[in-house]
Structures are given as structure tokens and as C-alpha cells.
């Protein structure tokens, strides 16, 4: 029975899905599995949160010249990871996200960073660091998450190609030539997760800003129910459409992050 044109194209497309960044291949790579796998490795003393956080930051910095996925790197991530290791030694982990490397999109307020919205002009106009975290970032930290930094997006999260005037064009990890879009606007989070730099990260979604880059980069992107996740401390795009949620490589990991950030807005 002859196959349809759509089936033929689907088969051929797999031949070109070759990432230009080498994926983690060893089963012992702590960043290659799920969050549950990672925490099980910590419990076996295969690795520490500090070791894995250093590896995540090293990968991100080594690849960022090509990927343009990260706007700003945290200078407190290693301290957060070491604090998690201390809690682990005393059997006082806060939950499944404790010690887990995570990112947040550039439109989120993050203590100690300017909120640039991935815009070069906005970064010039408002260069000062903000004094507090957005509610979602604060909840990630309260859960013990290690925040690696802020990921690039389309300027002000208004487009769908991952084009930032601050960091440049975010690159799709499956495209050697730089022709295929990573999608947007939560492009940097999707790419960082896809490449095994972080387990999950925060994004926003009005008309597909999480779901589109998730599809293009082969990860999970969620648009939660409107109002499920608080929006305080995040640059708004469309007040009656804005939803915030996770991107991750695995559905279970996205669910863990959503569980940590969901709840009433205290503002």
C-alpha cells in the first residue's frame, strides 16, 4: 500500500534532526535523565548538586556563543547548590526540586539582575538590578531550586522566532545552518532544556510562547489554566491572556515545577 505524502515527509524529516551540540550520551550523566533520576543519583552519592550545577553552567557558557540561549548567568547558583548539598547531608531537603538546576525567562524579575526583557534598548534604559524575585522565581528558590540565570526571548516576549536585540538570534539545537527557528517567545528556556543544560525552566504563554518552542526543540511546554500561576513580578504582555508555566524535557519534570509555582498570588 503506497504511503501518503505526509508520511513520507515525516520519515525524511527524521534524517535531518541531528543536533549540532553533542547530546549527553552517558547514562551516568546527571543532566541526561529526569529529576527523579538526578535525585536518586544524589541519594547514592554518585554526584552532588554543586558538581552538577558547575557542569550545567560550564555547558551553558561554552555553548552560549552559538546558541544565544542565556541572557544573564547567576553568580549565586553555586552557593545555592552548596546549600542544597548541606541540606541533603542533614536529611532536610525541601522537596523534589531541591538542588535542581533551573532557568527563568528574561521577563521575570530576579533579585540582583536587571529585568531586560531581552531588549537591548530596555537594558540601557533600566540597567539597575531589581531588589526582589518574581513570585514564581521566589517559589522555585523556596523549593530549593538552583536558579542558573535568565534565558533569552523575543524582545518583550512579543514574537515567535527567538530573536533578541540583546542576545541575538537564539539557535535551534537541531539546526547546523541556523535556518530553522527555535520558536518563541520562550526560546532560550526551550533550547537550554533541550540541550541538557537545565532540567526545566520558566516561560510564559499567551498565543503559543511555551508550546511553539517546545514543539520546535523537542521538549514539553505548558500553558496552564489562566490564573493558576501568579504573575506578580513578570513583565506583562496581554493582561487577559498571560499564563506562566514550565518547559522541561519530561512531562513528570514539568509537573514538578508547575506544582512548585502554582497557587494564589499574594499580591
Regions inferred by a protein language model and the residue ranges of each:
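A short helix-breaking turn/cap at a secondary-structure junction
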Residues: 26-28, 223-267
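Predominant activation on well-ordered alpha-helical scaffold segments within soluble catalytic domains
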Residues: 36-39, 54-57, 78, 82, ...
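Short, well-ordered beta-strand elements within core beta-sheets of diverse protein domains
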Residues: 37-44, 124-128, 242-249
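Conserved active-site and cofactor/substrate-binding residues in soluble primary-metabolism enzymes
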Residues: 33, 47-51, 76, 131, ...
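An N-terminal boundary/leader segment
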Residues: 1-80
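N-terminal, positively charged, Ser/Thr/Ala/Gly-biased leader segments
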Residues: 65-124
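Short glycine/serine-rich loop/turn segments
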Residues: 98-244
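Sec-exported extracytoplasmic/periplasmic mature domains
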Residues: 43, 57-65, 82, 86-89, ...
